[in-house]
Amino acid sequence: MADLSFNDKMILIQYAIQKYENEAVLIEKLKTVLSEKDAQRGIDTLIGTQRVRRIGPEILENNVSHTELPDLPDHLRPIADNL
């Protein structure tokens, strides 16, 4: 698989959160595309920038009231669909 840019990883994680809100399930699904460290770092970055919020101990949610979900680029669509 081609290397993904930082922004591609953030967008992919946001779309994965839209599909799987449970953090443990989310990380397992993202492991097919990203390392666990990259997935966790991306989640932490998205929480820190308030694009994602934590609802309880295990649930993540896109913070669409704060920022819109970015458009999914065509080259990421097959990856996001296969998660």
Predicted regions: what is each one?
Residues 47-58:
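A short, conserved structural fragment
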